[in-house]
Amino acid sequence: MTQLEWRTIFANNLLCILREKGMSQSQLARDSGLSVSRISEYINMISTPTIFAIINIAYALDMDVNELVDFDSRIV
C-alpha cells in the first residue's frame, strides 16, 4: 500500500466516523489537542498523521486505534 493510498483510506474512515458521531472537525481538534488545520490536512490527504496524532484522534473519538485504521470496514 502506498502512502497516498493509506492517507486516502484514513481520510475516508475519519470522515465516516465524524459523520456517524455527528462531530465537527473543530470538535475533534479541540478534543484531540490537534489544530483544526491539522485535522483538515488529514481529511484532505495533505499530510500523513503521526502515531501520536492517530492515538489522540482515536481517544477523542472514544474508539480503539485499530477501529480508526481498519481499512476494510468503512466506505464513504
Residues of each region from the PLM?
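Short alpha-helical DNA-recognition segment
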Residues: 22-41
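Residue-level detection of the helix-turn-helix DNA-binding "recognition helix"
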Residues: 19, 33, 44, 73
